[in-house]
Amino acid sequence: MALKLGVIGTGAIGQDHIRRCSKTLVGSQVVAVTDINLEQAAKVVRDLDLGAEVYADGHALIAAPDVEAVLVCSWGPSHEEYVLAAIAAGKPVFCEKPLAVTAEGCRHIVEAEIASGRRLVQVGFMRPYDQGYRALKAAIDSGQIGEPLMLHCAHRNPSVGENYKTDMAITDTLIHELNVLRWLLDDDYVSVQVVFPRKTSKALAHLKDPQIVMLETVKGTRIDVEVFVNCQYGYDIQCEVVGETGIARLPEPSQVQLRSEAKLSNAILMDWKDRFIAAYDVELQDFIDGVKGGTLYGPSAWDGYAAAVAADACVLAQNTGAVVPITLAMRPVFYS
C-alpha cells in the first residue's frame, strides 16, 4: 500500500520532491500539499495531476488524518516549527536542510524526538546516498589505505546570485561537507579555522571568495575544504582522502570522454541538480521504505544538530580568523 505523503513547501525543491515521489519512486502517494503561496500549491497539484488536497498551512496538513508522513520543503526558518509539530503528531518527517536555522533549534528537535521514543526525523543531506561517496566510504572502511590522515576537498560553483553573502559559504555550501565528511570518517570535529586567499575578481564586492576551511577531528585527521563559489568553469566537487598506505579519491561523475579536434576532453557539469539527481532519488526512496518498514536509517536529527554546531563555529572562525573549538555533546544512545 502506498505511503500517503503531505508536502509543505512547493518551491523548487518541493516541486522536485513531489514530482519524484509521484512519478519516479515507488510506494508513495502525495495526498496533501501547502505553501505560503496557496495559488502556487494549487498550480503544482493541477500541473502534476496529483488529485491532492491543498491545505491552508503546514499545521493543518500535518493534522490531516490521511497524511501518514510529512516532507518539509519550506523556507528554512519554518523548518523547526513544522518538524516539532510532526513529531508531536507522531508522524515521520523528512526535512530538507537546514533542520533548523540555529543549533539550539536543532537541539529542541533532538530532545522532542528522543522524548517521543522512536526515530521520526530524516534530514535532507543527500551526499551519503551518492554512488561516488558510497564507493569512497567503502574504500576507507575496507582499510585499503590504512587510517585516514588528511582530506583535501573542494566545493566549487560557477557563480552565485547577488543575495549570496560570505557566511552562506558555510551555511548553504560547506554544510554539505560538514555532514558528509563526518559520515565518511565516522568522526566528529573539534576545531576549525577559516582563511581567505586572494579574492577572485569574479565575486561581487560584498562577498569574500574563495575561502579555505581547515577542520580537525577527534581522531586527529586534518581536513581542508576549498569553497569557491565563483569558479566560472563548472560545478565541481572534489574529495581526496590521504591514508597511511594509500590515497582514495571521490570518482568523477560518469561523462563521455571525447576525442576530437586534437583534444581529449570530459565535460564538467554546471548544475548541482545534475550532479546529485540520482542521490535525491535514492534518498527519498530510503525515507519511504524506512517509514513503511518501521525504521529510518538516513541522516538523523542528531546529524542535523552536529552540522549546525559545526557551522556556527565555522562562521565564528570566518569573523575572527582564529582557531575556534567545536564543542559537541556526546551522541545520545538513542542515535547510536
From Swiss-Prot:
The keyword Magnesium does not apply. It comes from the Bacteria. The keyword Oxidoreductase applies. Its EC number is 1.1.1.18. GO terms for biological process: inositol catabolic process. It catalyses: myo-inositol + NAD(+) = scyllo-inosose + NADH + H(+). One of its GO terms (molecular function) is inositol 2-dehydrogenase (NAD+) activity. Homotetramer. Involved in the oxidation of myo-inositol (MI) to 2-keto-myo-inositol (2KMI or 2-inosose). This is Inositol 2-dehydrogenase. It comes from Pseudomonas syringae pv. syringae (strain B728a).
